[in-house]
Amino acid sequence: YKVMPILVTFMIMSAVLSMFIDSITVILFLAAVTVELSQLLKFSPVPMVLAEIFCANLGGSATMCGDPPNIIIGTALGYSFADFLTNTGLIAGIALIAIIVFFFFAFKKELSANKNEKVDPSTFPNPSDAIENKKDFIISTVIFIIAIVLLVSHAQTGLTVAFIGVAIALITLLTSIKDIGFILKKVDYKTLLFFIGLFIVVGGLEQTGVLEMIASFIEKVCGGNVFAMVLIIMWISAIASAFVDNIPFAATMVPVIKSLAATTAGADLSVLAYALSVGTDIGGSATPIGASANVVGTSVISKAGHPVGWGKYCKTAIPATAIVLIIAMVVIKFRYF
């Protein structure tokens, strides 16, 4: 069995799924499958999971609903699913090709080390056994497809992303009426309270003029050079998001880029927004703590007996992050300037 085609397939799958599903959920699923596969085919799951984590964050940057920062930026500035798909999605698509090539050669030696190991096909599980309830499987698949269609067409239908999210959640609850109590208990209320508090703090900073001071400082540093401003926003966002949660950072920076667009001649708010989006989404991929998906993925393989330290993680993640940001710079330069 050749492991490298599996690596490429899982990287693409991770990126595509993360365009529509939360990256944490995607990595929980793919990392578990990868660990299972590694035991069957006798290879280390570490390289494959690290590649999946990166591609999940990259895929999430392609759409408005892929990563929380994109939802915050898109909702605050009134952008649609199509706006993100045709802008950050273009960058993510080009970058994905480069990243697949990068990880293919970065991990080829490690994943090919055990290619002579004998594998017994009779030990492979039957995929159909994973579906415990076909009725629930069909219902959940239909709901998922409806959600994607509504998100893609929300600019045409006039429905907001928030309304679609709540409506789909209610439909899901109604189809699982017997388990509604259990589901409601599992809702992450701490995160909801966190977001409420976060936007109160950001609103306070905006009203007191702190964010305008930050915008003014960036404008002075750039000296009126709009492209330099875009690069500063993208790289600062990426570096900050590698060490701090990108959600509050994105929420804080939205008023800043609005102020910059209003006071700087030639500055396009949408370009600043997409630079912020790419920076916050991709920057978090550089370190094990930069994004929730990173923490979840490394935790899954650590529990399987394959601990991943900072050195192992950053050895490929930092160069991969730099590659994506450089591609983003080139695309932004040729498309908008």
Regions found by a protein language model. Give the residues of each.
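Membrane-interfacial helix-loop connectors
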Residues: L17-I53, P68, I72-N87, D188, ...
